From Swiss-Prot:
Family: Belongs to the AccD/PCCB family.
Claim: Cell division is one of the keywords in the record: no
Enzymatic reactions: propanoyl-CoA + hydrogencarbonate + ATP = (S)-methylmalonyl-CoA + ADP + phosphate + H(+); butanoyl-CoA + hydrogencarbonate + ATP = (2S)-ethylmalonyl-CoA + ADP + phosphate + H(+)
Subcellular location: Mitochondrion matrix
Gene field: Pccb
Protein name, UniProt field: Propionyl-CoA carboxylase beta chain, mitochondrial
Length: 541
């Protein structure tokens, strides 16, 4: 495996050397120098391609990790990478850092631009073989330069993070470098997509840049995100915790929600990142790419007519509905292991990218809670920022009750999802498959939050609450509870009261859902919304 990786590294290095030649520098008149300018350039370039040297490259491979340049080679289209600042070196003179042995062309990060499936992207890849990928002033300067360029031309930024943190020898200059990067992250937010792929350690101040980007992915077993490491935690709180427990991929994809997905290894992560990139527009001013679609837009889906159980309390898998409706069952789920009671992700309808949001009856009956509300809100806001239409599948019995939720701030966090849907001006299509109870009905992209098209299936139950709870209030003391429940269901727990009032646009046959959505998306493609001017909104953070 290591040998194969080395071969790829050499090949990648050769391609990079070719791409970076043609600088137009002449050596005429310099023959008296011991080493010509051209030879010096070649030597510097060769040193840059080797990073921290073969010994450190081998150590990187033994950890099951690719080098910074190998990662770029796998991520980008062959021959498309145009490197910048290959000759930049750190400026630190303290602690022996001025010695030639501590100078590496390019320092500890590789930066530049390239293409993924022919589409422009800017990339930085931290090089753990050089000072552990630690961030120096020069390192930060290189990253900031490509981020500025990406904002200027309107292209995404992908960061491949593998760094031990700030370079201690540089002191405050390293901290200033982090702040410079954070500022670019904020400036670029909502302008260009920003993606972080954590492929090694990422600790201390370094963690805030991935946290500010739109999506954070991790590699299992080799990547870590934490503000303070296990040793500091032990000294301060007396907790014994491993790196993996504290900030590993499992922790951040299942417990904290900091990371959006985790992949098995570097190769798997980079291949998935290429696929994910295909769903995204280059900027907020550009449409998402359109893929040729061989899945008929008017395709009927007969299995949807029986997917919702007749028993209102029986669970089913919302993913079965999503996969059946979208193009070729291709769904890139975001945060699949976190807050599983809501499903979010990207798909295509008739070749065009859409954002999917759906309650998951298989988990907590699809109730909204703190984590699912925050997960859904962040996804909805990303889609709105980058003009990606939203399709929402609703089966929600309400917000999860209990002191843990109330003490945790479910009111404030639940309001985030409501706010996100209300704020969104992209095309919004909602399908109520079964339950839509109480305030959760309002929150899930209802007509009242300016949903463009709102459908209900015949199995929909749109009401203030479920029949049992309602009967206990309305028919308190009533002798025939079953009759009372039947009366409530007849009057309220069905799609007709909402349809009569225009709160749903139509009650549709489930099998026609794909055809109806594709047709609506075509009509809504020219949608324009004008809102009152404001400096910025104040979402309940």
């Amino acid at each position: 495996m290591a040998a194969a990786i080395r071969i790829r590294a050499v090949a990648a290095g050769a391609r990079l050397s070719v791409l970076n030649c043609g600088l137009g520098i002449t050596t005429r008149g310099l023959c008296s120098q011991p080493v010509s300018v051209k030879e010096r350039i070649d030597n510097k370039r060769h040193a840059a391609l080797l990073g921290g040297g073969q010994r450190r490259i081998d150590a990187q491979h033994k950890r099951g990790k690719l080098t910074a340049r190998e990662r770029i080679s796998l991520l980008l289209d062959p021959g498309s990478f145009m490197e910048s600042d290959m000759f930049v070196e750190h400026r630190c003179a303290d602690f022996g850092m001025a010695a030639d042995k501590n100078k590496f062309p390019g320092d500890s990060v590789v930066t530049g631009r390239g293409r993924i499936n022919g589409r422009l992207v800017y990339v930085f890849s931290q090089d753990f073989t050089v000072f552990g990928g630690s961030l120096s002033g020069a390192h930060a300067q290189k990253i900031c330069k490509i981020m500025d360029q990406a904002i200027t031309v309107g292209a995404p930024v992908i960061g491949l993070n593998d760094s031990g943190g700030a370079r201690i020898q540089e002191g405050v200059e390293s901290l200033a470098g982090y702040a410079d990067i954070f500022l670019r992250n904020v400036t670029a937010s909502g302008v260009i997509p920003q993606i972080s792929l954590i492929m090694g350690p990422c600790a201390g101040g370094a963690v805030y840049s991935p946290a500010l980007t739109d999506f954070t992915f991790m590699v299992k077993d080799t990547s870590y995100l934490f503000i303070t490491g296990p040793e500091v935690v032990k000294s301060v709180t007396n907790e014994d915790v491993t790196q993996e427990q504290l900030g590993g991929a499992k922790t951040h994809t299942t417990v904290s929600g900091v990371a959006h997905r985790a992949f098995d290894n570097d190769v798997d992560a980079l291949c998935n990142l290429r696929e994910f990139f295909n769903f995204l527009p280059l900027s907020s001013q550009d449409p998402a790419p359109i893929r040729e679609c061989h899945d008929p837009s008017d395709r009927l889906v007969p299995e949807l007519d029986t997917v919702v159980p007749l028993e209102s309390s029986k669970a089913y898998n919302m993913l079965d509905i999503i996969h059946a409706v979208i193009d070729e069952r291709e769904f890139f789920e975001i945060m699949p292991s976190y807050a599983k009671n809501i499903v979010v992700g990207f798909a295509r309808m008739n070749g065009r990218t859409v954002g999917i949001v759906g309650n998951q009856p298989n988990v907590a009956s699809g109730c909204l809670d703190i984590n699912s509300s925050v997960k859904g809100a962040r996804f909805v806001r990303f889609c709105d920022a980058f003009n990606i239409p939203l399709i929402t599948f609703v089966d929600v019995p309400g917000f999860l009750p209990g002191t843990a939720q109330e003490y945790g701030g479910i009111i404030r966090h639940g309001a985030k999802l409501l706010y996100a849907f209300a704020e969104a001006t992209v095309p919004k299509i909602t399908v109520i498959t079964r339950k839509a109870y109480g305030g959760a009905y309002d929150v899930m992209s209802s007509k009242h939050l300016l949903g463009d098209t709102n459908y209900a299936w015949p199995t929909a139950e749109i009401a203030v609450m479920g029949a049992k709870g309602a009967v206990e209030i309305i028919f308190k003391g009533h002798q025939d509870v079953e009759a009372a429940q039947a009366e409530y269901v007849e009057k309220f727990a069905n799609p007709f009261p909402a349809a009569v009032r225009g709160f749903v646009d139509d009650i549709i046959q489930p099998s026609s859902t794909r055809a109806r959505i594709c047709c609506d998306l075509e009509v809504l493609a020219s949608k324009k919304v004008h809102r009152p001017w404001r400096k910025h909104a104040n979402i309940p953070l």
